[in-house]
């Protein structure tokens, strides 16, 4: 009888070990969301003469501005790995401190609503540097086989190296980073890129619809936007002075 009870006790313990993680996961609730809406309190939209759109959302402690180039869809296809870029500014207005995690995710609404996390800048730099090294090796091997192509291939390689070096430098200096914000240092800002190599993300559509999710500790700030914002929308860029 005692042996029978011990066997059932072991079974019960095993079931608890299986069920407890599941129950713990089930209790985790999704974060509440606040969404940008045209005309809503704390929400604004601006077309700048610099050729960029700005969506701003505010509450009592934070101002968050999303900036997107009006030609970003075209520019993304000319960028390394065709990454999509946005610029975010977060300004803290409180008197204490605020931990900004710089955790952004993009929903590609018209592409099966695929969600992509932001590209890690260090991983992106490493990937590009590896591709540069590979291109150097391949080019040198091609020139060795066909010396008459040396001038043309060397020129292309140097251009590729220059563009790659500039992009790596950009990633290391201009990317959005986590920050502790306070009255003495109230602002975090920088570029963020999202991959578009997912098999569900095809050629850009007209218009393209996106949903940027900015994750904070207590809630998610959502910026739905389209490129262009309205059909046929065109910004006349102010020429540089």
Where do the protein language model's features map onto the residues?
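Sec/Tat signal peptide C-region and signal peptidase I cleavage site
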Residues: 22-26
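Helix-centric, low-specificity signal for extended rod-like, repetitive segments
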Residues: 1-3, 20-21, 120
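Bacterial N-terminal signal peptides
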Residues: 12-20
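Bacterial N-terminal signal peptides that target proteins for export
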Residues: 2-12
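Conserved functional micro-motifs across diverse proteins
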Residues: 27-241
């Amino acid at each position: 009888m005692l042996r029978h009870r011990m066997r059932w006790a072991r079974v019960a313990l095993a079931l608890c070990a299986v069920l407890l993680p599941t129950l713990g996961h089930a209790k985790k609730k999704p974060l509440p969301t606040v969404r940008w809406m045209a005309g809503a309190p704390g929400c604004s939209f601006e077309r700048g003469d610099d050729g960029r759109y700005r969506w701003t959302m505010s509450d009592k402690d934070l101002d968050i501005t999303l900036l997107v180039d009006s030609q970003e869809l075209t520019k993304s296809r000319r960028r390394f790995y065709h990454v999509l870029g946005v610029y975010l500014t977060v300004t803290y207005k409180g008197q204490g401190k605020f931990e900004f995690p710089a955790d952004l995710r993009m929903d590609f609404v018209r592409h099966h609503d695929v969600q992509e996390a932001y590209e890690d800048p260090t991983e992106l730099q490493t990937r590009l540097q590896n591709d540069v090294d590979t291109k150097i090796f391949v080019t040198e091997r091609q020139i060795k086989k066909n010396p008459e192509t040396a001038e043309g291939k060397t020129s292309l390689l140097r251009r590729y190296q220059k563009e790659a070096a500039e992009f790596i430098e950009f990633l290391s200096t201009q990317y959005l980073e986590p920050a502790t914000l306070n009255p003495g240092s109230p602002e975090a800002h920088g570029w963020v890129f999202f991959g578009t190599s997912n098999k569900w993300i095809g050629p850009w559509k007209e218009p393209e619809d996106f949903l940027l999710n900015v994750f904070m500790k207590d809630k998610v700030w959502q910026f739905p936007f389209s490129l262009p914002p309205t059909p046929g929308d065109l910004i006349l860029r102010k020429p540089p002075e």
